[in-house]
């Protein structure tokens, strides 16, 4: 029998989501696994829209397409899945965004070790009682069952054999595959071990999946053992948090619930008091807020295609569910700020990209609110004729022309007890698809299509740029003004393919060269060079003359641009070497940009580089520059290069023979870019910024050479302007700004306190206007010029003065000159609540008369509206309704 988790391990088990994640990664790091940062939600695999599983970044390694980053690895991978989007919020465990904790073995340990560690982690680190655990194995995997039974000690009755559909993993119809074993948590172990049904979602939740990749499946379905067997595992962070935090669903864990509470506060509702429909809306908002924040952080923008459409759909679902809760003002930015605050610890990139995230949320929400307003007007016109059904054509027009979601049309129609012709909608949708398909046939080739068309017919371009900056070449193909052509004339925008070129084509993070092509009375200004496979494409404009396929031209690189790019590229190599020396020898490159006037280097690192470390790095690099190291460049076999210690980038594909750039004693890297001959040519190096771009990925931006002087001059000018403005010497500026900040902070606090006191003071004069209704004190009054928090304070103060029988309703315009914003607050005493009147429910109904809604707690609630002209009538209705509802004796 498996040993029970010790009481000490259970007592000290991690509980917060942050601790659960860190405990997993530390557990496997202590067992020789390299900690890998989460990859982007935008995968490198072009066949996959979004990162949907923890193993996806390692798929090329599992398939033998890339070398392994280490024998063992562990990660917490950001994932997005939208295939079950309609179940989000309705079930306990469906999400769009989630984190998958994983440990991976690439030809290293296998089944027994994976099982033993999974059990040790679950019972000893997480402190789960083995009596709460059940495991599943593939029906034919006798080895896994034997390990669970004889090595780990699990009761045979709690080892369940499952079919291939549940417990056999495959990357596709052919290729690596193997059985898997899953660990389930049993919420009701008291029901016993007989007749266990793992499909009982109320009793069991699967939280850890172990995949044993041990076979290769051929086209005929035959399985043969793999030479190198792999382990791929996944543990849902949110699921483990639900188990350890002992909450009824994933949404009520500390990974999501703070966002649900933020949304509830915006809607002035109490999550615990809501019905299932209201709770579902809050869960959708909480879940989707995490998803959209991470998607935008990783570079997705809202659109009608691909990832952009997924983002747009999620954003619009958040807005729609907010409206269902009575939130009728823009609130995505507020939810975005809450999500950033919640995620920033594990995903610092959201802080660095905060401005981008919030701007995209604001822009897309504003666009959708305009859409909703237009669509609601049209829908109101349709409903005004009191139809029994909204036709499919009408619903499709709302969807296609106004972007009005079908589900929102259904919800509004349902409120009016009207149906929507869904079959007719599908017919209209299919007709539109067919029209789009027919139209697509006649669309002209895009520029990229044209480039790929002409480049696809050409052999690889011979690159001469390592040894020469000008070279005679023959024009092989032309794209003129976006279309393939055989000739070009002055003024034309062109893409030119040459048989050979000294121009460096953009690649390896380095931008393409600039320069010119010239011939007899012909000049082409080249402003960029890209690559289409191995063909170099020179883009620019015809400055003079005529150019034709077959012409000979002199290709000349802009020497100044090349020198600056070379200096920045070599400086990037020195930067990586310095990071390894100062911060961590295990630091690996995650990306880079080498431009003419700046450089950027992204690298795997779990924490920010400190100011002291940045200073050390700068000093080290400038020292190497001053030492005037001569670079050595040579080609060699990939295995020989790696054996010599050359640094390669994980995920990059390399040929059998590679180019090695060596700064002797400092840096050795596989690199196809251009470099200085001697480090002294770089001149100077200066770091200008360090930031986080994603979980576990940091970025350093820097300048080198003449750009350093330009940067320092610019900074000096800023310091001079600040000194003039503050009438201070440069050394005094920081102290002056700090003092001003403290003064501003103190003034803000004093102003807020004064406003709150003023609101309570204004309200104090209203207490005398209360009227007796039986044993109750009824007060309904107007108080303009006070914001929501102040109005709540005033209402609560009045209720306290009037006692347990107080029924207080205060309404007003925060800005008396703006009729577009109304605030209503209700504060009820204990006796009023005992009389079955609740502030939250009551004020929401009154606010509808002002074109709004809201709610809150039984004793205190706030609502809003958009029609200030209706406020007097709404307050009169509140007075009469309360007077009628309060018991008279």
Swiss-Prot record:
Binds 1 zinc ion per subunit. It holds the Pfam family tRNA-synt_2c. It is an enzyme of class 6 (ligase). InterPro entries: aa-tRNA-synth_II/BPL/LPL, Ala-tRNA-lgiase_IIc, Ala-tRNA-ligase_IIc_anticod-bd, Ala-tRNA-synth_IIc_core, Ala-tRNA-synth_IIc_N, Ala-tRNA_ligase, Ala_tRNA_ligase_euk/bac, DHHA1_dom. Its main location: cytoplasm. It catalyses: tRNA(Ala) + L-alanine + ATP = L-alanyl-tRNA(Ala) + AMP + diphosphate. Zn(2+) binds at residues 569, 573, 671, 675. Belongs to the class-II aminoacyl-tRNA synthetase family. This is Alanine--tRNA ligase. The lineage of its organism: Bacteria, Bacillati, Cyanobacteriota, Cyanophyceae, Synechococcales.
């Amino acid at each position: 029998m498996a040993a029970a988790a010790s009481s000490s391990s259970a007592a000290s088990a991690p509980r917060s989501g942050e601790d659960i994640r860190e405990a997993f990664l530390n557990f496997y790091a202590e067992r020789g696994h390299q900690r890998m940062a989460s990859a982007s939600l935008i995968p490198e695999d072009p066949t996959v829209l979004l990162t949907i599983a923890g193993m996806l970044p390692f798929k090329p390694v599992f398939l033998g397409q890339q070398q392994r980053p280490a024998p063992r690895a562990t990660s917490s991978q950001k994932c997005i899945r939208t295939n079950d989007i309609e179940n989000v919020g309705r079930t306990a465990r469906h999400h769009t965004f989630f984190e998958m904790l994983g440990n991976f073995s690439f030809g290293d340990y296998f089944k027994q070790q994976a099982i033993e560690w999974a059990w040790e982690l679950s019972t000893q680190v997480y402190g789960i009682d083995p009596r709460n655990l059940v495991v599943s194995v593939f029906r034919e995997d006798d080895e896994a069952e034997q390990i669970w039974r004889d090595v780990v000690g699990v009761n045979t009755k709690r080892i369940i054999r499952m079919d291939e559909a549940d417990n056999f993993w495959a990357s596709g119809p052919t290729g690596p595959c193997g059985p898997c074993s899953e660990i389930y948590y049993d919420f009701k172990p008291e029901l016993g071990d007989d007749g266990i049904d793992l499909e009982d979602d109320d009793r069991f939740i699967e939280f850890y999946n172990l995949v044993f990749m041990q076979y290769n499946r051929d086209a005929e379905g035959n399985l043969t053992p793999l030479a190198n067997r792999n382990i791929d595992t996944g543990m849902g962070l949110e699921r483990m948090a639900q188990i350890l935090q002992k909450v009824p669903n994933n949404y009520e864990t500390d990974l999501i619930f703070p966002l649900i509470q933020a949304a509830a506060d915006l809607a002035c509702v109490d999550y615990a008091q809501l019905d299932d429909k209201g709770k579902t809306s809050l869960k959708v908002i909480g879940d989707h807020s995490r998803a959209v924040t991470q998607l935008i952080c990783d570079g997705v923008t809202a659109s009608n295609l691909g990832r952009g459409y997924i983002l747009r759909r999620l954003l619009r679902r958040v807005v729609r569910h907010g409206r269902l809760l009575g939130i009728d003002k823009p609130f995505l930015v507020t939810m975005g700020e809450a999500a950033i605050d919640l995620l920033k610890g594990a995903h610092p990139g959201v802080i660095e990209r905060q401005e981008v995230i919030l701007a995209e949320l604001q822009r897309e929400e504003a666009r959708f609110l305009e859409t909703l307003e237009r669509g609601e007007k049209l829908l109101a016109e349709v409903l005004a004729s009191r139809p029994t059904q909204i036709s499919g054509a009408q619903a499709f027009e709302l969807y296609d022309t106004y972007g009005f979601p079908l589900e929102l049309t259904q919800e509004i129609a349902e409120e009016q007890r009207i149906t929507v012709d869904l079959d007719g909608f599908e017919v209209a949708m299919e007709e539109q698809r067919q029209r789009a398909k027919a139209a697509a046939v006649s669309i002209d080739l895009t520029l990229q299509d044209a480039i790929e068309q002409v480049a696809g017919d050409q052999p690889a371009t011979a690159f001469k740029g390592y040894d020469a900056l000008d070279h005679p070449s023959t024009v092989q193909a032309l794209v003129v003004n976006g279309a393939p052509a055989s000739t070009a004339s002055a003024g034309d925008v062109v893409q030119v393919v040459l048989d050979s070129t000294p121009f460096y084509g953009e690649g390896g993070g380095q931008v393409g060269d600039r320069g010119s092509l010239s011939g007899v009375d012909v000049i082409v200004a080249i402003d960029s060079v890209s690559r289409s496979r191995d063909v170099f494409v020179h883009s620019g404009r015809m400055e003079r003359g005529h150019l034709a396929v077959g012409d000979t031209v002199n290709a000349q690189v802009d020497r100044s641009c090349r020198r600056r790019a070379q200096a920045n590229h070599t400086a990037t190599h020195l930067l990586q070497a310095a990071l390894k020396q100062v911060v961590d020898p295990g630091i690996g490159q995650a990306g880079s940009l080498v431009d003419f006037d700046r450089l950027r280097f992204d690298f795997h690192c779990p924490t920010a580089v400190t100011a002291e470390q940045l200073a050390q790095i700068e000093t080290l690099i400038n020292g190497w520059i001053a030492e005037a190291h001569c670079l050595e460049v040579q080609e060699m076999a990939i295995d020989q290069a790696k054996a010599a210690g050359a640094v390669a980038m994980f995920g990059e594909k390399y040929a059998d023979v590679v180019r090695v750039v060596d700064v002797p004693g400092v840096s050795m890297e596989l690199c196809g870019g251009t470099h200085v001959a001697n480090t002294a040519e770089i001149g100077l190096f200066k770091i200008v910024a360090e930031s986080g771009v994603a979980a576990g990925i940091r970025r350093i931006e820097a300048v080198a050479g003449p750009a350093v002087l330009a940067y320092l001059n610019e900074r000096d000018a800023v310091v001079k302007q600040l000194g003039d403005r503050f009438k201070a010497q440069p050394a005094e500026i920081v102290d002056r700004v700090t003092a001003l900040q403290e003064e501003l902070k103190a003034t803000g606090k004093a102003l807020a306190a004064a406003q709150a006191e003023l609101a309570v003071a204004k309200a104090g004069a209203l207490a005398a206007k209360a009227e007796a209704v039986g044993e109750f004190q009824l007060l309904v009054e107007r108080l303009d010029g006070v914001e929501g928090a102040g109005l709540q304070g005033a209402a609560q103060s009045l209720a306290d003065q009037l006692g347990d029988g107080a029924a207080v309703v205060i309404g007003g315009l925060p800005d008396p000159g703006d009729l577009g914003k109304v605030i209503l607050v209700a504060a009820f005493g204990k006796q009023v609540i005992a009389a079955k009147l609740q502030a939250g429910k009551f004020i929401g109904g009154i606010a509808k008369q002002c074109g709004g809604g809201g709610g809150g707690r039984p004793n205190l609630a706030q609502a809003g509206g958009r029609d200030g002209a209706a406020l007097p009538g709404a307050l009169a209705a509140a007075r009469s309704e309360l007077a009628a509802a309060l018991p008279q004796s």
